[in-house]
Amino acid sequence: MSNPCQKEACAIQDCLLSHQYDDAKCAKVIDQLYICCSKFYKDNGKDSRSPCCPLPSLLELKMKQRKLTPGDS
């Protein structure tokens, strides 16, 4: 498995570039990355790593701040 959630991470870069780095306009793609990463950690364990995903503790905080649950899509 190479770089899980890379597609979602690249979508964030594309979105930010096309919206002059206004992250508010990219909230949906950011949420999609967090949901993908949550699934990645659920499937592979919290000791797994992907360069595209924040560490599990930060991911949990970000998902809580954005009111996301792992089952969202």
UniProtKB/Swiss-Prot annotation:
Pfam families: CMC4 (PF08991). One of its GO terms (cellular component) is mitochondrial intermembrane space. InterPro entries: CMC4, Cys_alpha_HP_mot_SF. Keywords: Disulfide bond, Mitochondrion, Repeat. Residues 2-44 form the CHCH domain. A motif (Cx9C motif 1) lies at residues 5-15. The keyword Metal-binding does not apply. Disulfide bonds join C5-C36, C15-C26. It is found in: Mitochondrion intermembrane space. SUPFAM superfamilies: Cysteine alpha-hairpin motif. A motif (Cx9C motif 2) lies at residues 26-36. PANTHER family: CX9C MOTIF-CONTAINING PROTEIN 4. The twin Cx9C motifs are involved in the recognition by the mitochondrial disulfide relay system. Belongs to the CMC4 family. This is Cx9C motif-containing protein 4, mitochondrial.
